[in-house]
């Protein structure tokens, strides 16, 4: 398993538009299970509504974990997405 921590910098946090794009990005990696954890609650990043229910706001620290095929590459790609969009 590979993981990284990230502090959300988007002024409105993870809202509908970036959440939808994030889910779409994660769908490219069907061989991996990608989860996001905030405040002790974890969600599969293929589940848009579960992600939205976490209520991630600017300044929150989240942990993204990747398990499965080519963890290093998938983790790096998702981390780059976070840096560019969140």
Describe the role of every protein-language-model region:
Residues 1-10:
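Short amphipathic
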Residues 6, 29, 81-82:
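Aromatic side chains
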Residues 5, 33-35, 61-63:
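Residues at or immediately flanking beta-strands
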Residues 53-86:
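C-terminal structural segments of small proteins and small subunits
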